[in-house]
Amino acid sequence: MTDPITPGIRAYIDSRRIADDYDRYFHYNELFRFDTQVLDRWMREPGRLLDLGCGTGRHLVHFAARGFEVTGVDLSEHMLAVARRKLAAERCSATLVQGDITQLGGLGLGRFDYAICMFSTLGMIYGAGNRLAFLRSIREHLDAGGLLASHVHNRWHNLYYADGREYLWSAFRRRLRGEPEAFQKDVDGYRGIRGISLYVFTASEIRRLLAAAGLALDELLYLNHRRNGVLRGLFRGLRANGFLLCARKPDGTA
């Protein structure tokens, strides 16, 4: 199977500079406030929560303070070091695991009531088969009725700027040629890292992917341009600046 972590993503993971500057860089990102509000609505009752690709721990601190039993997994030792300092500063408790989220079966994590995979972490996994296997693995780590929340980028939002339209045109040409991962988006040079790319979804595609993983979609929110609220109205599938999703492991399933 194709390696789920591309060299560019691995360089991002391994960068201490990225980790140490992460919270400052994203301080004014409105999605970081809005997604927390949405998660609080979806996950009202404290329980066991697994944060996949937890980064510097913004959700770990928040949910630990709410009384959740939280576990964070990230491959970056530098991100986890920042998360550990933030948890200590807030006198919050969490289990931190340095590991590959695409290999959950080998981490001995147990079962959870909730799992979150935020800020396009799902799109950072390369390969359709790898993304499906990852979601199926999450399902295996949820108790029956357990919830998964995630954020992904919207492919069609690329229509609104020139570089995005060029990406779409190139992607469709790759698709016609039968190339694998035709809609993988090159973001080379992002934060000074060469070779970064990520997968961007359509609403219908994310619905199909969740169904194939055995997860029932509870809610799909279309994000407005500033990603600080829900987009409504006509053609929102084309206009949305990404999606927040909540899916459930059906009751009565192992």
Residue ranges and their predicted role:
Residues A149-L209, E219-R226:
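SAM-dependent methyltransferase
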Residues R232-A254:
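Core SAM-dependent methyltransferase catalytic element
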Residues R58-Q103:
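Class I SAM-dependent methyltransferase SAM/SAH-binding core
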Residues Y114-G129:
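A short SAM/SAH-binding and catalytic strip from SAM-dependent methyltransferases
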Residues G106-Y114:
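A short acidic, Gly/Pro-enriched loop at the edge of an enzyme's catalytic core
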Residues L132-A144:
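A short glycine-rich, Lys/Arg-flanked "PGG" loop and its adjoining helix->strand segment in the class I
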Residues M1-G53, R58, H62:
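Conserved class I S-adenosyl-L-methionine
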